[in-house]
Curated annotation (Swiss-Prot):
Alphabetical keyword list: Glycoprotein, Membrane, Phosphoprotein, Sugar transport, Transmembrane, Transmembrane helix, Transport
Protein's UniProt keywords contain Transmembrane: yes
Species lineage: Eukaryota, Fungi, Dikarya, Ascomycota, Taphrinomycotina
Regions that span the bilayer: 10-30, 59-79, 88-108, 113-133, 145-165, 180-200, 267-285, 302-322, 329-349, 364-384, 405-425, 433-453
Protein's name in the database: High-affinity glucose transporter ght5
Protein backbone atom coordinates (compact mmCIF):
# COMPACT_ATOMS: atom_id res chain seq x y z
CA UNK A 1 0.00 0.00 0.00
CA UNK A 2 2.84 2.40 0.87
CA UNK A 3 4.53 2.13 -2.52
CA UNK A 4 1.22 2.61 -4.31
CA UNK A 5 0.48 5.77 -2.30
CA UNK A 6 3.93 7.15 -3.10
CA UNK A 7 3.46 6.54 -6.83
CA UNK A 8 0.02 8.19 -6.78
CA UNK A 9 1.46 11.17 -4.91
CA UNK A 10 4.29 11.53 -7.43
CA UNK A 11 1.90 11.49 -10.37
CA UNK A 12 -1.08 13.49 -9.21
CA UNK A 13 0.41 16.10 -6.88
CA UNK A 14 3.08 16.84 -9.48
CA UNK A 15 0.34 17.35 -12.07
CA UNK A 16 -0.10 20.78 -10.49
CA UNK A 17 3.32 21.56 -11.94
CA UNK A 18 2.28 20.11 -15.30
CA UNK A 19 -0.62 22.59 -15.41
CA UNK A 20 1.79 25.47 -14.84
CA UNK A 21 4.23 24.18 -17.44
CA UNK A 22 1.51 23.71 -20.04
CA UNK A 23 0.47 27.35 -19.71
CA UNK A 24 4.07 28.60 -19.82
CA UNK A 25 5.04 26.40 -22.75
CA UNK A 26 2.07 27.26 -24.92
CA UNK A 27 1.90 31.06 -24.73
CA UNK A 28 5.11 31.79 -26.67
CA UNK A 29 3.96 29.82 -29.69
CA UNK A 30 0.33 30.91 -29.45
CA UNK A 31 1.17 34.62 -29.63
CA UNK A 32 2.90 33.96 -32.96
CA UNK A 33 -0.01 32.08 -34.56
CA UNK A 34 -1.59 33.92 -37.46
CA UNK A 35 -5.21 33.78 -36.27
CA UNK A 36 -4.32 34.78 -32.71
CA UNK A 37 -2.34 37.75 -34.01
CA UNK A 38 -5.16 38.86 -36.29
CA UNK A 39 -7.48 39.03 -33.27
CA UNK A 40 -5.26 40.33 -30.50
CA UNK A 41 -2.22 42.07 -32.04
CA UNK A 42 -2.26 45.86 -32.27
CA UNK A 43 -0.09 46.37 -35.36
CA UNK A 44 -0.60 45.40 -38.99
CA UNK A 45 1.79 45.81 -41.93
CA UNK A 46 -0.18 45.78 -45.23
CA UNK A 47 3.01 45.49 -47.27
CA UNK A 48 4.03 42.17 -45.72
CA UNK A 49 0.49 41.23 -44.64
CA UNK A 50 1.76 40.49 -41.14
CA UNK A 51 0.73 41.32 -37.60
CA UNK A 52 2.85 42.24 -34.60
CA UNK A 53 2.51 43.44 -31.02
CA UNK A 54 3.71 46.52 -29.29
CA UNK A 55 6.18 45.70 -26.52
CA UNK A 56 3.61 46.66 -23.89
CA UNK A 57 0.84 44.43 -25.24
CA UNK A 58 3.11 41.44 -25.76
CA UNK A 59 4.50 41.84 -22.25
CA UNK A 60 1.01 42.03 -20.74
CA UNK A 61 -0.38 39.01 -22.60
CA UNK A 62 2.68 36.95 -21.74
CA UNK A 63 3.35 38.17 -18.22
CA UNK A 64 -0.02 38.73 -16.52
CA UNK A 65 -0.21 35.09 -15.45
CA UNK A 66 2.66 35.95 -13.11
CA UNK A 67 0.66 38.80 -11.56
CA UNK A 68 -2.18 36.41 -10.78
CA UNK A 69 0.31 33.88 -9.43
CA UNK A 70 1.81 36.52 -7.14
CA UNK A 71 -1.53 37.08 -5.41
CA UNK A 72 -2.40 33.39 -5.55
CA UNK A 73 0.56 32.63 -3.28
CA UNK A 74 -0.85 34.86 -0.53
CA UNK A 75 -4.39 33.54 -0.97
CA UNK A 76 -3.19 29.95 -0.59
CA UNK A 77 -1.97 30.36 3.00
CA UNK A 78 -5.20 31.04 4.95
CA UNK A 79 -7.10 28.41 2.98
CA UNK A 80 -4.55 25.63 3.49
CA UNK A 81 -4.36 26.40 7.22
CA UNK A 82 -8.14 26.08 7.46
CA UNK A 83 -8.95 23.08 5.25
CA UNK A 84 -5.59 21.39 4.65
CA UNK A 85 -3.35 21.06 1.61
CA UNK A 86 -5.20 18.23 -0.14
CA UNK A 87 -8.59 19.98 -0.22
CA UNK A 88 -6.92 23.28 -1.11
CA UNK A 89 -5.24 21.69 -4.13
CA UNK A 90 -8.65 20.47 -5.32
CA UNK A 91 -10.18 23.94 -4.86
CA UNK A 92 -7.44 25.72 -6.80
CA UNK A 93 -7.62 23.13 -9.56
CA UNK A 94 -11.24 24.18 -10.12
CA UNK A 95 -10.10 27.81 -10.29
CA UNK A 96 -7.54 26.76 -12.93
CA UNK A 97 -10.21 25.04 -15.04
CA UNK A 98 -12.37 28.18 -14.99
CA UNK A 99 -9.36 30.23 -16.12
CA UNK A 100 -8.71 27.95 -19.10
CA UNK A 101 -12.37 28.19 -20.14
CA UNK A 102 -12.10 32.00 -20.04
CA UNK A 103 -9.03 31.84 -22.30
CA UNK A 104 -10.57 29.47 -24.83
CA UNK A 105 -13.81 31.47 -25.11
CA UNK A 106 -12.07 34.83 -25.55
CA UNK A 107 -13.73 37.24 -27.98
CA UNK A 108 -11.65 39.49 -30.26
CA UNK A 109 -10.50 41.55 -27.28
CA UNK A 110 -7.05 41.14 -25.86
CA UNK A 111 -8.35 42.34 -22.48
CA UNK A 112 -10.26 39.07 -21.96
CA UNK A 113 -7.10 37.10 -22.64
CA UNK A 114 -5.23 39.23 -20.11
CA UNK A 115 -7.96 38.85 -17.44
CA UNK A 116 -8.15 35.11 -18.08
CA UNK A 117 -4.39 34.85 -17.64
CA UNK A 118 -4.60 36.68 -14.30
CA UNK A 119 -7.37 34.32 -13.13
CA UNK A 120 -5.42 31.26 -14.23
CA UNK A 121 -2.36 32.67 -12.50
CA UNK A 122 -4.21 32.78 -9.16
CA UNK A 123 -4.47 28.99 -9.23
CA UNK A 124 -0.95 28.42 -10.56
CA UNK A 125 0.55 30.58 -7.80
CA UNK A 126 -1.43 28.84 -5.06
CA UNK A 127 -0.57 25.39 -6.41
CA UNK A 128 3.13 26.28 -6.63
CA UNK A 129 3.03 26.68 -2.83
CA UNK A 130 0.71 23.79 -2.04
CA UNK A 131 2.08 20.97 -4.18
CA UNK A 132 5.78 21.04 -3.15
CA UNK A 133 4.72 21.67 0.46
CA UNK A 134 2.41 18.66 0.44
CA UNK A 135 5.12 16.47 -1.06
CA UNK A 136 7.70 17.64 1.49
CA UNK A 137 5.44 16.85 4.43
CA UNK A 138 4.39 13.39 3.26
CA UNK A 139 7.67 12.15 1.75
CA UNK A 140 10.22 10.22 3.85
CA UNK A 141 13.42 12.14 4.55
CA UNK A 142 15.60 9.93 2.35
CA UNK A 143 13.33 10.43 -0.68
CA UNK A 144 12.08 13.98 -0.13
CA UNK A 145 14.44 15.60 -2.64
CA UNK A 146 13.51 13.11 -5.35
CA UNK A 147 9.78 13.39 -4.70
CA UNK A 148 9.70 17.20 -4.67
CA UNK A 149 11.84 17.23 -7.82
CA UNK A 150 8.99 15.49 -9.63
CA UNK A 151 7.08 18.79 -9.37
CA UNK A 152 9.70 20.50 -11.51
CA UNK A 153 9.81 17.43 -13.77
CA UNK A 154 6.09 17.87 -14.33
CA UNK A 155 6.58 21.58 -15.07
CA UNK A 156 9.12 20.75 -17.78
CA UNK A 157 6.92 17.94 -19.08
CA UNK A 158 4.03 20.37 -19.44
CA UNK A 159 6.27 22.86 -21.27
CA UNK A 160 7.49 20.16 -23.67
CA UNK A 161 4.05 18.75 -24.46
CA UNK A 162 2.69 22.27 -24.97
CA UNK A 163 5.47 22.92 -27.49
CA UNK A 164 4.58 19.66 -29.27
CA UNK A 165 0.93 20.69 -29.43
CA UNK A 166 1.85 24.13 -30.78
CA UNK A 167 3.98 22.44 -33.42
CA UNK A 168 0.97 20.45 -34.54
CA UNK A 169 -1.69 23.17 -34.37
CA UNK A 170 0.00 26.29 -35.74
CA UNK A 171 -0.94 25.31 -39.32
CA UNK A 172 -4.61 24.68 -38.55
CA UNK A 173 -7.27 27.06 -39.83
CA UNK A 174 -8.80 29.96 -37.94
CA UNK A 175 -9.27 29.78 -34.14
CA UNK A 176 -8.41 26.08 -33.97
CA UNK A 177 -4.75 27.14 -34.17
CA UNK A 178 -4.73 28.50 -30.64
CA UNK A 179 -7.96 27.25 -29.07
CA UNK A 180 -6.90 23.60 -29.35
CA UNK A 181 -3.55 24.45 -27.78
CA UNK A 182 -5.24 26.30 -24.91
CA UNK A 183 -8.18 23.93 -24.54
CA UNK A 184 -6.06 20.81 -24.07
CA UNK A 185 -5.04 22.27 -20.71
CA UNK A 186 -8.52 21.43 -19.43
CA UNK A 187 -7.50 17.77 -19.58
CA UNK A 188 -4.56 18.31 -17.22
CA UNK A 189 -6.78 20.05 -14.67
CA UNK A 190 -9.39 17.29 -14.76
CA UNK A 191 -6.73 14.59 -14.30
CA UNK A 192 -5.26 16.49 -11.34
CA UNK A 193 -8.62 16.97 -9.63
CA UNK A 194 -9.60 13.30 -9.95
CA UNK A 195 -6.20 12.04 -8.81
CA UNK A 196 -5.95 14.33 -5.78
CA UNK A 197 -9.39 13.23 -4.58
CA UNK A 198 -7.94 9.78 -3.83
CA UNK A 199 -4.93 11.05 -1.84
CA UNK A 200 -4.70 11.22 1.97
CA UNK A 201 -4.07 14.46 3.82
CA UNK A 202 -0.61 15.36 5.13
CA UNK A 203 0.02 13.60 8.49
CA UNK A 204 1.77 16.70 9.86
CA UNK A 205 -1.28 18.83 9.09
CA UNK A 206 -3.61 16.28 10.70
CA UNK A 207 -1.49 16.15 13.86
CA UNK A 208 -1.37 19.95 13.99
CA UNK A 209 -5.19 20.10 14.07
CA UNK A 210 -5.61 17.24 16.56
CA UNK A 211 -6.59 14.43 14.16
CA UNK A 212 -3.89 12.09 15.43
CA UNK A 213 -5.61 8.78 14.68
CA UNK A 214 -6.01 9.66 11.00
CA UNK A 215 -2.37 10.73 10.88
CA UNK A 216 -1.19 7.44 12.40
CA UNK A 217 -3.21 5.42 9.90
CA UNK A 218 -1.73 7.35 6.96
CA UNK A 219 1.82 7.07 8.32
CA UNK A 220 1.38 3.32 8.75
CA UNK A 221 0.11 2.90 5.18
CA UNK A 222 2.92 5.04 3.79
CA UNK A 223 5.50 2.77 5.45
CA UNK A 224 3.76 -0.61 4.99
CA UNK A 225 3.85 -1.12 8.75
CA UNK A 226 1.21 -1.51 11.49
CA UNK A 227 0.36 1.50 13.64
CA UNK A 228 1.91 -0.18 16.70
CA UNK A 229 5.31 -0.55 15.07
CA UNK A 230 8.19 1.32 16.68
CA UNK A 231 9.09 3.19 13.46
CA UNK A 232 5.59 4.66 13.21
CA UNK A 233 5.34 5.43 16.92
CA UNK A 234 8.79 7.03 17.06
CA UNK A 235 8.10 9.27 14.06
CA UNK A 236 4.65 10.14 15.39
CA UNK A 237 5.96 11.22 18.80
CA UNK A 238 8.69 13.37 17.28
CA UNK A 239 6.23 15.12 14.93
CA UNK A 240 3.68 15.48 17.75
CA UNK A 241 6.23 17.03 20.10
CA UNK A 242 7.48 19.37 17.38
CA UNK A 243 3.96 20.50 16.48
CA UNK A 244 3.03 21.14 20.11
CA UNK A 245 6.17 23.21 20.67
CA UNK A 246 5.74 25.25 17.50
CA UNK A 247 2.00 25.84 17.87
CA UNK A 248 2.19 26.77 21.55
CA UNK A 249 2.16 30.45 20.62
CA UNK A 250 -0.91 30.11 18.39
CA UNK A 251 -1.10 30.61 14.62
CA UNK A 252 1.75 32.66 13.15
CA UNK A 253 0.96 36.17 11.96
CA UNK A 254 2.41 37.78 8.85
CA UNK A 255 4.69 40.13 10.83
CA UNK A 256 6.08 37.16 12.78
CA UNK A 257 7.67 35.58 9.72
CA UNK A 258 9.91 38.65 9.54
CA UNK A 259 10.72 38.46 13.26
CA UNK A 260 14.03 37.23 14.72
CA UNK A 261 12.90 33.59 15.07
CA UNK A 262 12.39 32.92 11.37
CA UNK A 263 13.33 35.89 9.19
CA UNK A 264 16.64 34.34 8.12
CA UNK A 265 14.77 31.49 6.43
CA UNK A 266 12.03 33.81 5.15
CA UNK A 267 14.56 35.92 3.27
CA UNK A 268 16.53 32.84 2.19
CA UNK A 269 13.44 31.28 0.58
CA UNK A 270 12.47 34.60 -1.00
CA UNK A 271 16.00 34.98 -2.35
CA UNK A 272 16.23 31.45 -3.74
CA UNK A 273 12.88 31.65 -5.53
CA UNK A 274 13.71 35.10 -6.93
CA UNK A 275 17.09 33.90 -8.14
CA UNK A 276 15.45 30.94 -9.86
CA UNK A 277 13.82 33.45 -12.20
CA UNK A 278 16.91 35.66 -12.40
CA UNK A 279 18.97 32.77 -13.74
CA UNK A 280 17.23 33.61 -17.03
CA UNK A 281 15.36 30.40 -17.80
CA UNK A 282 12.10 32.08 -18.74
CA UNK A 283 13.93 34.33 -21.16
CA UNK A 284 14.02 31.20 -23.32
CA UNK A 285 10.66 29.70 -22.38
CA UNK A 286 8.53 32.83 -22.76
CA UNK A 287 10.36 34.26 -25.76
CA UNK A 288 12.04 31.20 -27.27
CA UNK A 289 10.21 31.73 -30.55
CA UNK A 290 11.57 35.26 -30.94
CA UNK A 291 15.04 34.25 -29.72
CA UNK A 292 15.45 31.48 -32.28
CA UNK A 293 13.80 33.48 -35.05
CA UNK A 294 16.48 36.10 -34.41
CA UNK A 295 19.22 33.51 -34.94
CA UNK A 296 17.99 32.89 -38.48
CA UNK A 297 16.55 29.40 -37.92
CA UNK A 298 13.97 28.39 -40.53
CA UNK A 299 11.59 26.82 -38.01
CA UNK A 300 11.53 28.62 -34.65
CA UNK A 301 8.75 26.24 -33.52
CA UNK A 302 11.11 23.30 -34.04
CA UNK A 303 14.03 25.07 -32.36
CA UNK A 304 11.91 25.91 -29.31
CA UNK A 305 10.70 22.30 -29.25
CA UNK A 306 14.31 21.06 -29.14
CA UNK A 307 15.08 23.35 -26.21
CA UNK A 308 11.97 22.20 -24.34
CA UNK A 309 12.90 18.56 -24.99
CA UNK A 310 16.36 19.14 -23.51
CA UNK A 311 14.72 20.80 -20.51
CA UNK A 312 12.34 17.89 -19.93
CA UNK A 313 14.94 15.18 -20.46
CA UNK A 314 17.58 16.74 -18.22
CA UNK A 315 15.12 17.25 -15.36
CA UNK A 316 15.13 13.46 -14.92
CA UNK A 317 18.75 13.90 -13.88
CA UNK A 318 17.59 16.23 -11.13
CA UNK A 319 15.77 13.29 -9.51
CA UNK A 320 19.17 11.82 -8.68
CA UNK A 321 21.42 14.89 -8.45
CA UNK A 322 19.68 16.37 -5.40
CA UNK A 323 19.66 13.09 -3.48
CA UNK A 324 23.22 12.03 -4.27
CA UNK A 325 24.94 15.43 -4.16
CA UNK A 326 22.64 17.39 -1.85
CA UNK A 327 21.27 20.89 -2.39
CA UNK A 328 24.19 23.32 -1.90
CA UNK A 329 26.82 22.09 -4.35
CA UNK A 330 24.44 21.49 -7.30
CA UNK A 331 23.07 25.02 -6.86
CA UNK A 332 26.52 26.61 -6.64
CA UNK A 333 28.03 24.66 -9.54
CA UNK A 334 24.85 25.06 -11.58
CA UNK A 335 24.85 28.84 -11.18
CA UNK A 336 28.51 29.09 -12.23
CA UNK A 337 27.88 26.87 -15.27
CA UNK A 338 24.85 28.92 -16.27
CA UNK A 339 26.78 32.17 -15.94
CA UNK A 340 29.39 30.90 -18.40
CA UNK A 341 26.78 29.72 -20.92
CA UNK A 342 24.90 33.03 -20.82
CA UNK A 343 28.12 35.02 -21.21
CA UNK A 344 29.10 33.07 -24.33
CA UNK A 345 25.53 33.20 -25.68
CA UNK A 346 25.44 36.99 -25.29
CA UNK A 347 28.93 37.50 -26.71
CA UNK A 348 28.20 35.46 -29.84
CA UNK A 349 24.80 37.09 -30.33
CA UNK A 350 26.21 40.56 -29.91
CA UNK A 351 29.40 40.21 -31.97
CA UNK A 352 28.94 37.44 -34.54
CA UNK A 353 25.27 36.77 -35.26
CA UNK A 354 24.61 39.65 -37.67
CA UNK A 355 26.97 40.20 -40.60
CA UNK A 356 27.86 43.67 -41.85
CA UNK A 357 25.42 43.28 -44.74
CA UNK A 358 22.57 42.65 -42.27
CA UNK A 359 22.17 38.90 -42.91
CA UNK A 360 22.30 36.30 -40.15
CA UNK A 361 25.35 34.15 -39.54
CA UNK A 362 23.77 30.71 -39.20
CA UNK A 363 26.89 29.21 -37.65
CA UNK A 364 26.77 31.79 -34.89
CA UNK A 365 23.06 31.05 -34.49
CA UNK A 366 23.83 27.35 -34.10
CA UNK A 367 26.44 28.14 -31.42
CA UNK A 368 23.86 30.22 -29.55
CA UNK A 369 21.35 27.38 -29.61
CA UNK A 370 24.01 24.94 -28.34
CA UNK A 371 24.81 27.18 -25.38
CA UNK A 372 21.11 27.71 -24.76
CA UNK A 373 20.80 23.93 -24.45
CA UNK A 374 23.86 23.81 -22.17
CA UNK A 375 22.17 26.37 -19.92
CA UNK A 376 19.02 24.28 -19.80
CA UNK A 377 21.10 21.13 -19.15
CA UNK A 378 22.27 22.72 -15.90
CA UNK A 379 19.10 24.56 -14.88
CA UNK A 380 16.89 21.52 -15.29
CA UNK A 381 19.00 19.47 -12.87
CA UNK A 382 19.83 22.16 -10.31
CA UNK A 383 17.99 25.46 -9.98
CA UNK A 384 14.77 24.23 -11.55
CA UNK A 385 13.95 21.56 -8.95
CA UNK A 386 16.21 22.56 -6.02
CA UNK A 387 14.53 25.91 -5.38
CA UNK A 388 11.20 24.16 -4.70
CA UNK A 389 12.95 21.57 -2.52
CA UNK A 390 14.56 24.24 -0.33
CA UNK A 391 11.33 26.18 0.12
CA UNK A 392 9.36 23.00 0.79
CA UNK A 393 11.62 21.74 3.56
CA UNK A 394 13.06 24.82 5.31
CA UNK A 395 10.21 26.04 7.55
CA UNK A 396 8.68 24.85 10.85
CA UNK A 397 5.02 23.87 10.64
CA UNK A 398 3.83 26.99 12.51
CA UNK A 399 5.32 29.28 9.86
CA UNK A 400 5.36 26.96 6.85
CA UNK A 401 2.33 28.12 4.88
CA UNK A 402 3.06 31.84 5.22
CA UNK A 403 6.82 31.57 4.66
CA UNK A 404 6.35 29.37 1.60
CA UNK A 405 3.79 31.83 0.23
CA UNK A 406 6.14 34.79 0.67
CA UNK A 407 9.08 32.89 -0.84
CA UNK A 408 7.11 31.84 -3.90
CA UNK A 409 5.86 35.39 -4.52
CA UNK A 410 9.47 36.30 -5.29
CA UNK A 411 9.42 33.83 -8.15
CA UNK A 412 6.22 35.22 -9.62
CA UNK A 413 7.15 38.87 -9.12
CA UNK A 414 10.42 38.47 -11.00
CA UNK A 415 8.67 36.26 -13.54
CA UNK A 416 6.31 39.13 -14.36
CA UNK A 417 9.08 41.73 -14.47
CA UNK A 418 11.18 39.59 -16.81
CA UNK A 419 8.29 38.63 -19.08
CA UNK A 420 6.93 42.19 -19.28
CA UNK A 421 10.19 44.10 -19.74
CA UNK A 422 12.05 41.60 -21.94
CA UNK A 423 10.51 42.98 -25.19
CA UNK A 424 11.58 46.51 -24.22
CA UNK A 425 15.08 45.42 -23.18
CA UNK A 426 15.76 43.23 -26.21
CA UNK A 427 14.56 46.00 -28.53
CA UNK A 428 17.07 48.30 -26.85
CA UNK A 429 20.19 46.18 -26.25
CA UNK A 430 19.49 42.94 -28.13
CA UNK A 431 21.50 39.90 -27.07
CA UNK A 432 23.54 41.95 -24.58
CA UNK A 433 20.62 41.12 -22.28
CA UNK A 434 22.40 37.82 -21.66
CA UNK A 435 25.21 39.59 -19.78
CA UNK A 436 22.68 40.64 -17.13
CA UNK A 437 21.62 37.04 -16.55
CA UNK A 438 25.28 35.94 -16.47
CA UNK A 439 25.89 38.39 -13.62
CA UNK A 440 22.74 37.27 -11.78
CA UNK A 441 23.94 33.66 -11.87
CA UNK A 442 27.26 34.68 -10.30
CA UNK A 443 25.36 36.43 -7.52
CA UNK A 444 23.21 33.33 -7.05
CA UNK A 445 26.27 31.13 -6.51
CA UNK A 446 27.60 33.51 -3.84
CA UNK A 447 24.25 33.71 -1.99
CA UNK A 448 23.86 29.94 -1.83
CA UNK A 449 27.43 29.53 -0.56
CA UNK A 450 26.95 32.09 2.21
CA UNK A 451 23.40 31.40 3.39
CA UNK A 452 21.94 28.00 2.38
CA UNK A 453 22.50 24.96 4.62
CA UNK A 454 22.90 21.44 3.27
CA UNK A 455 19.72 19.55 4.27
CA UNK A 456 20.11 16.29 2.38
CA UNK A 457 18.81 13.29 4.37
CA UNK A 458 17.43 15.29 7.32
CA UNK A 459 13.87 15.16 8.58
CA UNK A 460 11.91 18.42 8.60
CA UNK A 461 12.35 18.55 12.38
CA UNK A 462 16.13 18.17 12.06
CA UNK A 463 16.29 20.88 9.40
CA UNK A 464 14.60 23.24 11.83
CA UNK A 465 17.18 22.32 14.49
CA UNK A 466 20.00 22.89 11.98
CA UNK A 467 18.93 26.46 11.24
CA UNK A 468 18.41 27.20 14.94
CA UNK A 469 21.85 25.83 15.84
CA UNK A 470 23.66 28.89 14.49
CA UNK A 471 26.07 26.79 12.42
CA UNK A 472 27.59 28.47 9.38
CA UNK A 473 26.32 27.01 6.07
CA UNK A 474 29.81 26.45 4.68
CA UNK A 475 31.01 24.62 7.80
CA UNK A 476 30.49 20.88 8.52
CA UNK A 477 27.03 19.97 9.79
CA UNK A 478 26.77 19.82 13.64
CA UNK A 479 27.36 16.28 14.89
CA UNK A 480 24.33 16.23 17.18
CA UNK A 481 21.98 16.33 14.16
CA UNK A 482 20.72 13.25 12.39
CA UNK A 483 20.24 10.99 15.42
CA UNK A 484 16.54 10.51 14.74
CA UNK A 485 17.15 9.64 11.10
CA UNK A 486 19.83 7.11 12.00
CA UNK A 487 17.59 5.57 14.64
CA UNK A 488 14.80 5.24 12.09
CA UNK A 489 17.10 3.55 9.61
CA UNK A 490 18.30 1.05 12.22
CA UNK A 491 14.73 0.23 13.17
CA UNK A 492 13.71 -0.09 9.50
CA UNK A 493 16.52 -2.58 8.92
CA UNK A 494 15.31 -4.68 11.83
CA UNK A 495 11.71 -4.43 10.67
CA UNK A 496 12.27 -5.75 7.15
CA UNK A 497 12.04 -9.32 8.32
CA UNK A 498 8.75 -8.79 10.12
CA UNK A 499 6.79 -6.52 7.78
CA UNK A 500 4.73 -9.40 6.45
CA UNK A 501 3.81 -10.74 9.88
CA UNK A 502 0.76 -9.92 11.94
CA UNK A 503 1.03 -7.02 14.33
CA UNK A 504 0.20 -9.42 17.16
CA UNK A 505 3.56 -11.13 16.68
CA UNK A 506 5.62 -7.92 16.76
CA UNK A 507 7.74 -7.26 19.82
CA UNK A 508 7.36 -3.63 20.85
CA UNK A 509 9.56 -3.53 23.94
CA UNK A 510 12.49 -2.06 22.04
CA UNK A 511 10.10 0.29 20.29
CA UNK A 512 8.85 1.69 23.60
CA UNK A 513 12.42 2.21 24.73
CA UNK A 514 13.16 3.93 21.41
CA UNK A 515 10.22 6.24 21.91
CA UNK A 516 11.33 7.05 25.45
CA UNK A 517 14.87 7.72 24.26
CA UNK A 518 13.54 9.91 21.46
CA UNK A 519 11.40 11.83 23.93
CA UNK A 520 14.41 12.33 26.17
CA UNK A 521 16.41 13.62 23.21
CA UNK A 522 13.65 16.06 22.39
CA UNK A 523 13.29 17.29 25.96
CA UNK A 524 17.02 17.86 26.18
CA UNK A 525 16.87 20.24 23.25
CA UNK A 526 13.76 22.15 24.28
CA UNK A 527 13.16 24.82 26.88
CA UNK A 528 10.41 25.01 29.48
CA UNK A 529 8.05 26.65 27.00
CA UNK A 530 8.44 23.81 24.52
CA UNK A 531 10.63 25.64 22.02
CA UNK A 532 13.96 24.37 20.73
CA UNK A 533 17.10 25.50 22.55
CA UNK A 534 19.64 27.00 20.19
CA UNK A 535 23.21 25.99 20.89
CA UNK A 536 24.22 29.51 20.05
CA UNK A 537 22.42 32.62 18.96
CA UNK A 538 21.74 32.82 15.27
CA UNK A 539 20.43 36.38 15.27
CA UNK A 540 23.77 37.68 14.01
CA UNK A 541 23.51 35.34 11.03
CA UNK A 542 19.98 36.58 10.35
CA UNK A 543 21.06 40.19 10.54
CA UNK A 544 23.84 39.44 8.04
CA UNK A 545 21.36 38.00 5.55
CA UNK A 546 18.60 40.58 6.15
Amino acid sequence: MGKNLTIVMLVFVSMAGWMFGADTGSIGGITNMRDFQSRFADRYNPVTDSYSYSSARQGLITGMVNVGSFFGCFLSSPLMDRIGKRTSIMFWTIVYLIGIILQVTAVPSWVQIMVAKIWTGLSIGALSVLAPGFQSEVAPADLRGTIVTTYQLAVTGGIFIAACINMGTHKLHKTAQWRVSMGINLLWGIITFIGISFLPESPRYLISVGRDEEALQIMAKNNDLPIEHEVIQTEYHVIKSDCEAELAGGPATWPEIFGPDIRYRTFLGLGVMSLQQLTGDNYYFYYGFEVFEGTGMNSPYLSALILDAVNFGCTFGGLFVLEFFGRRMPLIIGALWQSITFFIYAAVGNRALTRKNGTSNHRAGAVMIVFSCLFIFSFAQTWGPAAYVIVGESYPIRYRSKCAAVATTGNWLWGFLISFFTPFITNSIGFKYGYIFAACNLCAACIIFLFAHETKGLTLEEINELYISGAKPWMPRPKNLGNFTKQQEEVREKSRGVQGESAAHLENVDGEEGIEDSSNDISSTTSSDGRAKPESSYHDQEEQFA
